[in-house]
């Protein structure tokens, strides 16, 4: 049976993650407060950041940058957008 969480990103109760997606306290906070749907949205945003900013996951600075962006995305003012990003029209 799926567990539900009060998702901090979506602002509603939704299906939670099966396990902490990131190590440490940040992973625990995400597991307890972020839904599966919101995590999927972050993965898409993270992929865009990696591709547009040409980040190398072998670079410790890039990994720290993404961790900072992930925390801002869920618990802060929101993650940065790549320079020149224009959101798709709805």
Curated annotation (Swiss-Prot):
Keywords: Iron
Keyword field contains Iron: yes
Any one Gene Ontology molecular-function term assigned to this protein's record: iron ion binding
A GO cellular component entry from the record: cytosol
InterPro entries documented for this protein: Fe_traffick_prot_YggX, Fe_traffick_prot_YggX_sf
Claim: Iron is one of the keywords in the record: yes
PANTHER family for the chain: FE(2+)-TRAFFICKING PROTEIN-RELATED
Function: Could be a mediator in iron transactions between iron acquisition and iron-requiring processes, such as synthesis and/or repair of Fe-S clusters in biosynthetic enzymes.
Assigned protein family: Belongs to the Fe(2+)-trafficking protein family.
Protein name: Probable Fe(2+)-trafficking protein
Species of origin: Nitrosomonas eutropha (strain DSM 101675 / C91 / Nm57)
Phylogenetic placement of the source organism: Bacteria, Pseudomonadati, Pseudomonadota, Betaproteobacteria, Nitrosomonadales
């Amino acid at each position: 049976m799926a567990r539900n969480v009060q998702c901090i990103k979506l602002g509603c109760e939704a299906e939670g993650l099966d396990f902490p997606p990131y190590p440490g306290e940040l992973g625990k906070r995400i597991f307890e407060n972020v839904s599966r749907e919101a995590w999927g949205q972050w993965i898409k945003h993270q992929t865009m950041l990696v591709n547009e900013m040409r980040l190398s996951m072998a670079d410790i600075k890039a990994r720290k940058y993404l961790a900072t962006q992930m925390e801002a995305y869920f618990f802060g003012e929101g993650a940065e957008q790549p320079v020149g990003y224009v959101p798709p029209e709805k």
